[in-house]
C-alpha cells in the first residue's frame, strides 16, 4: 500500500513538472504579440525583421526609434541617405502591390485612409498588416510608443518622446503672457479657398498655442471636417489680426484661386491683416500634413509669425 501511494505521488509530480515545462515552452515560443494604438489592438510579429512601410510619415517615426524598414513611398522631399536607399513602392496612395509582395515582408505598416484598399490582398497573402488612423499632431506620441514596442526599442521611444514633449512645452510656455491673437487659417488649393477647423493640422497647432481661430465662431457644435466654406464677406466681418494661408497644389493654380476668391476683391485690401502685412503663406511640408517630429519647429514658426517670439531647441 505504501509503495502504491509513493508511486502515485511520484506520478503526479512528474505530470505537474511536464505540464510546467510545456507551459514555459509555449510562452517562450510565441511568435506574435498584441499592441494598441489609439484604442485599436493589433496582432503583430513578436520580433519583425522585414517591415514594409507604405507611408513616409510612419517611416520617419519608425527610424526615430531606431527601427528599420525594407521600403518607402515615392517623394520629392529630401530624405536621409539611409531612407533614400530603400526601395520605393510608388506614390503613397498608389502602391505597386506586385513589388510589395515581392519583398516578402513579415509586417506591413500603412495608413487607413490611403491603404485600406490593399488590405484584403495582403491578408490573402498571409502578411500581417497594421493600418494606422494616424493624422493629427495628437497622434505623434501614441505612434512613437507603438513603434517602440513593435521594435522592442521602448527605451529609445521614451527618450524621443521626452525630447518631443519638452520642446512642445517650451514653445507653449513662450506664449503664456501674450494676448491671444485672432487668426484665420485659410486652405488654398487650385479648386478654391476654404478655412481650417481645429481638426486640421495648422488650426490644431494654432489652438495649442492659445490663439483664437475665428472660424470656430461660425461652427455649430462639433465637426470632423478639416475645412469648411469661408467667404471673403465672412473674413471681412471677422477681420482677424493674422491670416495664415496653407497651400496645396501648383503655385499658379493656387494664385489664381486666391485671386478669384479673395485678393482681387477691393475688400481684401481693407482687412487689418493685409494692411499690417500679416498675411503669411506657410509651407505645405510642415503645415498641410502632420509634421511629426517637426511639430515643435512648426509651432515655433507660428509663434514667430504671430508674436515675433523666437524659440530655439
Q: Where do the protein language model's features map onto the residues?
A:
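Structured C-terminal subdomain patch of bacterial secreted/periplasmic proteins
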Residues: 149, 242-313
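A short, structured surface patch at a secondary-structure boundary
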Residues: 53-103, 107, 112, 214
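Bacterial Sec-exported substrate-binding components of ABC uptake systems
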Residues: 2-8, 19-57, 155-186, 247, ...
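Short helix-initiation/N-cap motifs at beta->coil->alpha
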Residues: 36-38, 87-98, 220-231
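Proline-aspartate-enriched helix->loop->beta-strand connector
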Residues: 97-99, 104-110, 127, 232-245
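Extracytoplasmic ligand-binding site segments that recognize negatively charged/polar headgroups
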Residues: 117, 133-146, 184-205, 250-253
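Alpha-helical, coiled-coil/dimerization segments enriched in small aliphatic residues
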Residues: 75-78, 194-226
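Flexible loop/hinge segments that line or gate small-molecule binding clefts
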Residues: 79-82, 118-150, 280
Amino acid at each position: 500500500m505504501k509503495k502504491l501511494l509513493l508511486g502515485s505521488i511520484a506520478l503526479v509530480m512528474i505530470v505537474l513538472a511536464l505540464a510546467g515545462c510545456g507551459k514555459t515552452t509555449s510562452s517562450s515560443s510565441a511568435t506574435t504579440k498584441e499592441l494598441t494604438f489609439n484604442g485599436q489592438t493589433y496582432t503583430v510579429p513578436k520580433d519583425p525583421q522585414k517591415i514594409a512601410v507604405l507611408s513616409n510619415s510612419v517611416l520617419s517615426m519608425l527610424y526615430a526609434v531606431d527601427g528599420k524598414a525594407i521600403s518607402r513611398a515615392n517623394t520629392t522631399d529630401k530624405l536621409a541617405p539611409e531612407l533614400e536607399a530603400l526601395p520605393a513602392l510608388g506614390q503613397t496612395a498608389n502602391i505597386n502591390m506586385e513589388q510589395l509582395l515581392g519583398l516578402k515582408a513579415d509586417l506591413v505598416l500603412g495608413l487607413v485612409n490611403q491603404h485600406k484598399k490593399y488590405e484584403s490582398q495582403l491578408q490573402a497573402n498571409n502578411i500581417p498588416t497594421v493600418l494606422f488612423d494616424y493624422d493629427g499632431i495628437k497622434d505623434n506620441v501614441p505612434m512613437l510608443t507603438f513603434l517602440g514596442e513593435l521594435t522592442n526599442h521602448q527605451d529609445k521611444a521614451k527618450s524621443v518622446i521626452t525630447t518631443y514633449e519638452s520642446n512642445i512645452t517650451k514653445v507653449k510656455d513662450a506664449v503664456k503672457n501674450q494676448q491671444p491673437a485672432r487668426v484665420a487659417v485659410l486652405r488654398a488649393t487650385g479648386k478654391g479657398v476654404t478655412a481650417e477647423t481645429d481638426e486640421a493640422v495648422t488650426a490644431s497647432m494654432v489652438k495649442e498655442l492659445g490663439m483664437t481661430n475665428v472660424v470656430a465662431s461660425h461652427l455649430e457644435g462639433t465637426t470632423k471636417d478639416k475645412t469648411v466654406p469661408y467667404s471673403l464677406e465672412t473674413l471681412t466681418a471677422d477681420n482677424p489680426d493674422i491670416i495664415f494661408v496653407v497651400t496645396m497644389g501648383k503655385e499658379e493654380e493656387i494664385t489664381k484661386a486666391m485671386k478669384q476668391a479673395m485678393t482681387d476683391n477691393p475688400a481684401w485690401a481693407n482687412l487689418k491683416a493685409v494692411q499690417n502685412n500679416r498675411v503669411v503663406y506657410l509651407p505645405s511640408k510642415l503645415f498641410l500634413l502632420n509634421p511629426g517630429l517637426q511639430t515643435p519647429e512648426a509651432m515655433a514658426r507660428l509663434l514667430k509669425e504671430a508674436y515675433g517670439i523666437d524659440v530655439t531647441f
